[in-house]
Each structure stands twice: as structure tokens, then as C-alpha cells.
């Protein structure tokens, strides 16, 4: 059997490089938001109110329901949470 190693799970799962990079960025935002929510708010209801979403959206985020979140939605939530979002664009 031939084993391959990948730097990121999306490198293994997605062949399309455009989708793969989008997935990586969304994953990073979701992880950061979930950690921030866990460390900042008393409960999901409080987090939802602060982030301008419903409690079920917070639950979906914490469950890692990846396909339920667009990149712009995650950026909006991060900014409402007081997080700083930066973009680093570079040519390959």
C-alpha cells in the first residue's frame, strides 16, 4: 500500500485548488470562532445574541457543520465577536 501525507485534511479531500483554499479559510475561521465562543460567552444563547445569529447557528458552528457557513457569514460573526480578521494574498 502506498501512503500519502498531506499538510491539511482539505489537501487530501478536495482536488479543486480554489475550493480547497476556500475550505481551509472557512475551517480556520470556524475553529477560531468556536474557541472564542467557548472562552467568552456563558452559553450559546448569549453568544448568538452577541454575534447576531440564532442559537441553532452557534450550535451548528460548534458541531463543525461546515457546509452551513459561507465565508462572508463567518467573517461577519468574527467581526461581531471583536476578532480581527486579516487577509494575506500572495502569488505562488
What feature does the model see in each segment?
Residues 51-67:
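Recognition helix of helix-turn-helix/homeodomain-like DNA-binding domains
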Residues 43-44, 55, 74:
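Helix-turn-helix DNA-binding elements, focusing on the entry/boundary residues of the two helices
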Residues 71-87:
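DNA major-groove recognition helix of helix-turn-helix/homeodomain DNA-binding modules
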Residues 42, 53, 83:
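Short glycine/serine/threonine/alanine-rich loop segments
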Amino acid at each position: 500500500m502506498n501512503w500519502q501525507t498531506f499538510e491539511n485534511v482539505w489537501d487530501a479531500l478536495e482536488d479543486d485548488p480554489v475550493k480547497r483554499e476556500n475550505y481551509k479559510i472557512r475551517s480556520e475561521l470556524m475553529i477560531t470562532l468556536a474557541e472564542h465562543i467557548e472562552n467568552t460567552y456563558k452559553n450559546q444563547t448569549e453568544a448568538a445574541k452577541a454575534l447576531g445569529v440564532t442559537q441553532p447557528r452557534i450550535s451548528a458552528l460548534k458541531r463543525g457543520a461546515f457546509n452551513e457557513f459561507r465565508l462572508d457569514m463567518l467573517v461577519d460573526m468574527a467581526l461581531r465577536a471583536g476578532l480581527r480578521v486579516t487577509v494575506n494574498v500572495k502569488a505562488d
